[in-house]
């Protein structure tokens, strides 16, 4: 589990806050690393929609969506970062800030994307 004082953890929280806010204020200027995510939002959202078909984006809780957007972006664009790290980060943030079931939803969607899009079958190895 990431420590709250870990600068990388704090950076991810900051990006998620920006993405969360962006959902409600699309005309606002997105700050820092969140700009990269917003630039690829169409592709990221398409994958989330594809692998969470029972949950249209407008029905996904906004915090869960912000967490997923960052994680999916990282899976697609940050190949030097192991996918397990990306999933662990997202799940821990969902546990810390989301609802009781947020982490399960985030983990399920990310696991499916990893299997179907990245071709990785066994996530536990």
Q: What do the PLM-derived regions correspond to, one by one?
A:
Residues 1-97, 103, 109-125:
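N-terminal interaction/assembly modules
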